[in-house]
Amino acid sequence: MAAEPTARLSLLSDLTPPSLERTWLTAPHPTLPIVATCSSDKTVRVYSLTNFRLLSTISGGHKRSVRTCAWKPHVKGESVLATGSFDATVGIWRRWDSYGQTERGAADWGVGDSAGSGTQAKGLADGYGAGGDEENENEDEDEEWRFAVLLDGHDSEVKSVSWSPSGMLLATCSRDKSIWIWEDLDDGDNNFETVAVMQEHQGDVKCVAWHPAEDCLASASYDDTIRLWREDLDDWGQVACIKGHQGTVWCVDWEGVDSVPCGAAADLAEQWRATHALSGPRLVSCSDDRTVRIWRRQPKEPRAQQNTSPFGSSGIPSIIRPTGTDETWEEECTLPQAHDLSVYTVAWSKRTGLLASVGADGRIVVYAERFVGGDSATQAMETEPSADAAEGAPAPSTEWTVIATMDGAHDIYEINHVAWAKRADRGKAEGEDEEVLVTTADDGGVKVWTIAR
């Protein structure tokens, strides 16, 4: 019998005004208290997380629904947004972040991205009306979004876009079964160069997501597979094809680099980090088969780990493509069954390690991983110890449990997307690093939720 939820989801606010048409996805800015929402009305709506009001409407760049968007990381002085549309194009938008000072501020907003992120957040909160009524300035705000460049290459609807950790590479995927990787030349002229086109998927590619610390890309597809891609000697190629889902894989997301399960004592947390250092961050996926699954990379042999140079041990360049680039990924666990219909999005919090999933049943589900003892009652959902655990110590056992659910979160409508964001409104507890959940649905609405544990 499933355990009773131990946390509570509560509606904090709707983002207003909502779109009058279906909304697909909401992307929180990496350093500022704003989000961008993609809509079927061909626009992207930018909302404040300080007062939950519409700040800008980005329009004019696409001829059909805007399906996806992503903020470029590590940009100083401006915000850069990539948008993907059903018109088969990708747009790049820019806007200067010069908004003056604020009384309240959000100096702690940044998540270790840049030294100036706190000042940037404070200026934005003020200029975007943190606690004030600035709606009459919306028209001026709109004009400040500059449509920088249109990336044309896909033959069909663009389903997902994702920036690499450095912000230099942009991955896009499409119904045309291809994945494109573009390099931002950062030359001041908004020039992008096509780095790779990968066509190994045998169906519509639904999602692309970059590893949080490496230039490794994960993709999810209508062909029921997840694939991993890396660059080797200037040539991008597939290094793993993960099979396990019995239906379309809608979404993949990565674990945070320093994520540790809930309730960890210092020594246990250190043991966890040591035993997971070789395999790196895990991957989570969700599917038409109604499951949410976690995958872990098998560590390579120590010699392969040490000799990663394309020049080999001699230091002399080799004209032969090195072997051993393939990776082995295994299913670590399937999370407790909590959805009745297709699961469209799963999001892994980089701050808390919590997982959230949403889908066609209109339900929000939040999961937590915790350390457990070795008794047989907890073995069903436990992760397997790593055979290559550091210093021979076994990996601590964990299990995933559902800690909160919300049925009918958007009334009768399907929920298309969920994301974690840092809380920025006045109700935030002083000194607390709180997170909120942001859900995006077919009703055109975007809702912000708190989770009390």
Curated annotation (Swiss-Prot):
UniProt feature, compositional bias: Acidic residues: 132-142
Short name of one Pfam family: WD40
Entry keyword set: Repeat, WD repeat
WD repeats: 15-57, 61-103, 153-192, 200-239, 244-305, 338-377, 409-450
InterPro entries membership: CIAO1/Cia1, G-protein_beta_WD-40_rep, WD40/YVTN_repeat-like_dom_sf, WD40_repeat_dom_sf, WD40_rpt
Compositional bias ranges of the Low complexity kind: 309-319
Residues covered by region (Disordered): 107-142, 300-319
Top-level taxon: Eukaryota
Keyword field contains Disulfide bond: no
Any one Gene Ontology BP term: iron-sulfur cluster assembly
PANTHER family cross-referenced by the UniProt entry: CYTOSOLIC IRON-SULFUR PROTEIN ASSEMBLY PROTEIN CIAO1-RELATED, WD40 PROTEIN CIAO1
Protein purpose: Essential component of the cytosolic iron-sulfur (Fe/S) protein assembly machinery. Required for the maturation of extramitochondrial Fe/S proteins.
Family the entry assigns: Belongs to the WD repeat CIA1 family.
This protein's name: Probable cytosolic iron-sulfur protein assembly protein 1
UniProt source species: Aspergillus clavatus (strain ATCC 1007 / CBS 513.65 / DSM 816 / NCTC 3887 / NRRL 1 / QM 1276 / 107)
Gene name per UniProt: cia1
